[in-house]
Amino acid sequence: MSGKLIVLEGSDGSGKETQARLLASRRQHDGEPTRMVTFPNYAGEASAPVRMYLAGRFGTHPEDVNAYVASTFYAVDRFASYREDWGAFYESGGTVIADRYVTSNMVHQMTKIADAAECERFLAWLDDLEYTKFGLPRPDAVILLDLPQAVTARLIAEREGKDGGDIHERDSAYLRRCQAAYDVLEARYGWRRIPCSTGDRLRSKEDIHAEICRVLADI
């Protein structure tokens, strides 16, 4: 008996990890067997190509590694995590809350493809790769934590002052394309959008969490 998979998606700084932890804790408190997973799984050996890519080892811009190759890096990391860590729990009926998932591959890699027809082929290829060939479970719900691009840019700039950022975070044009991709995919796949700010002011994590719980009441 398969369990449930709920994905928290959104731009950097939108609070995915915080909200995933709050949601997992809430469901555990309610007596539902629940685990949280995070992607990329930087602690796992299979994330090595992802870490090298984000560090700029294969090129200093996201487009230096094409969408198909970069997607494979992330897909292998997810496959290893599923097989070694949370797959048995999920397949026995547990609920898994994921901070990012296949959805992030869709967003971040489709931005590298300008041609609309090729973008459609890429999305179909990625769906087959991760869900069919690698056998990863499809999400029961995707929550899109929505932040205006200007707020995202400010939060990333504040964080970059501490750690320098990765090749995605350092490319503002790339991040703007990702913001547009979120809008396209949310409409196409029925993701559930949660606004995380009012104007340029962030909502409290408690307020956002309460709305997520309301939106997921049927899952």
What residue spans do the PLM features occupy?
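Conserved lysine of the Walker
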Residues: 16
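A glycine- and Lys/Arg-enriched "phosphate-lid" helix/loop adjacent to the NTP-binding pocket
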Residues: 103-180
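Hydrophobic positions on the alpha1 helix immediately C-terminal to the Walker A/P-loop
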Residues: 19
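Pre-Walker A (Motif I) flank of P-loop NTPase domains
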Residues: 2-5
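Hydrophobic anchor at the beta1->P-loop junction of P-loop NTPases
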Residues: 8
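ATP-dependent small-molecule kinase phosphotransfer cores
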Residues: 30-134
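NTP-dependent small-molecule kinase module
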Residues: 22-24, 150-219
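P-loop (Walker A) phosphate-binding loop of NTP-binding proteins
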Residues: 11
